[in-house]
């Protein structure tokens, strides 16, 4: 899949492996993703964000020697479900979510993570328990 990737201090478009949903996760297609002020700050001052994160309990800082896919304000469409999901929403349903993945042992962020791509990728993984259905008639870009 294609993604806008923060790599070596620049944003580049490249391909990444397709994500595969694990237990409790949902594979989604990104329909729209806002450019947040935090994303702009990260683009210019990622090293400062990493230092700040080191002082926040429970947060894992980004490794700036590895790829990062930003994007934590997104609207997506459900494509598929991983194991152990309830499948309350049909594939094709538009959703948003907190930018976090519920994993065994805790929570991982989406977007400022080397392991969990954000909405600047064509597809991403979300936790089913955190999904919110986008109301019918509301445009994905709103």
Q: What is the predicted role of each segment?
A:
Residues 1-4:
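Short structural boundary motif marking the start of a folded domain
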Residues 6, 43, 79-81, 126:
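Short beta-strand-to-turn element immediately C-terminal to the catalytic PLP-Schiff-base lysine
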Residues 8-13, 59-60, 114:
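Short gly/ser/thr-rich secondary-structure transition/capping motifs
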Residues 13-15, 123:
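Well-ordered beta-strand positions in beta-sheet-rich domains
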Residues 41-49:
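Short Gly/aromatic-enriched secondary-structure transition segments
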Residues 60-67, 98-142:
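NAD(P)H dinucleotide-binding glycine-rich loop of Rossmann-like/cofactor-binding domains
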């Amino acid at each position: 899949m294609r993604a806008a990737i923060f790599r070596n201090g620049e944003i580049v478009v490249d391909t990444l492996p397709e994500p595969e949903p694990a237990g409790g996760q949902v594979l989604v297609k990104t329909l729209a993703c806002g450019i947040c002020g935090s994303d702009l700050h990260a683009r210019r001052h990622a090293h400062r964000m990493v230092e700040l994160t080191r002082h926040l309990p429970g947060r894992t800082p980004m490794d700036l020697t590895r790829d990062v896919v930003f994007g934590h304000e997104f609207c997506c469409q459900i494509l598929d479900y991983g194991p152990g999901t309830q499948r309350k929403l049909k594939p094709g349903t538009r959703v948003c979510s907190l930018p976090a993945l519920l994993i065994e042992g805790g929570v991982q962020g989406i977007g400022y993570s080397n392991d969990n791509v954000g909405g600047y990728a064509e597809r991403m993984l979300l936790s089913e328990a955190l999904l919110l259905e986008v109301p019918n008639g509301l445009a994905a870009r709103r």
